[in-house]
């Protein structure tokens, strides 16, 4: 049953479309000048109110490789870690970070398995539409809850 995970990983390692195009230098400069603008899914930008002032907040880009959202978060001052199972997607993040002088941690890992982080590591998890590619959402969300810092409401 887990063969679909390997097939999906192989596909993302070889796909070349808008979801895998890293930010250009010109796009990075636009991000530097404007409020943060990222999408969780095609055509739907995240409301800017969802983002607090960065102040070094730790953000996990879960299945978020590709050199787009992670770069935008790093530009805006977040402490960024990207976790993705696609080596080629992570290479795009590393390429943009190196080219633009950004700090982005990349971790190659499978979101269907225990996350390689301590409890309460991150302030925010940004997970663009990727949960549709896995069978066991409960485990993924359990792991996400485990690595998120607790806050008082």
Regions found by a protein language model. Give the residues of each.
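N-terminal, positively charged/glycine-rich alpha-helical extensions of SAM-dependent methyltransferases
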Residues: 1-29
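Class I SAM-dependent methyltransferase SAM/SAH-binding core
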Residues: 54-114
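Surface-exposed loop/turn positions
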Residues: 57, 121, 151-152
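A short acidic, Gly/Pro-enriched loop at the edge of an enzyme's catalytic core
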Residues: 112-125
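A short SAM/SAH-binding and catalytic strip from SAM-dependent methyltransferases
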Residues: 123-138
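A short glycine-rich, Lys/Arg-flanked "PGG" loop and its adjoining helix->strand segment in the class I
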Residues: 138-153
């Amino acid at each position: 049953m887990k063969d679909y995970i390997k097939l999906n990983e192989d596909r993302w390692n070889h796909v070349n479309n808008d979801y895998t195009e890293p930010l250009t230098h010109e796009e990075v400069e636009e991000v530097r000048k404007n409020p943060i603008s990222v999408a969780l899914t095609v055509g739907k930008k995240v409301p800017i109110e969802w983002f607090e002032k960065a102040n070094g907040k730790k953000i996990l880009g879960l299945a978020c490789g590709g050199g787009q959202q992670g770069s935008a978060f790093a530009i805006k001052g977040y402490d960024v870690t990207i976790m993705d199972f696609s080596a080629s997607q992570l290479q795009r993040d590393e390429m943009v970070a190196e080219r633009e002088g950004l700090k982005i941690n990349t971790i190659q890992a499978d979101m269907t398995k225990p996350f390689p982080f301590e409890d309460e590591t991150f302030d925010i998890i940004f997970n663009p539409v990727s949960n549709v590619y896995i069978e066991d959402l409960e485990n993924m969300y359990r792991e996400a809850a485990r690595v998120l810092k607790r806050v008082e409401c």
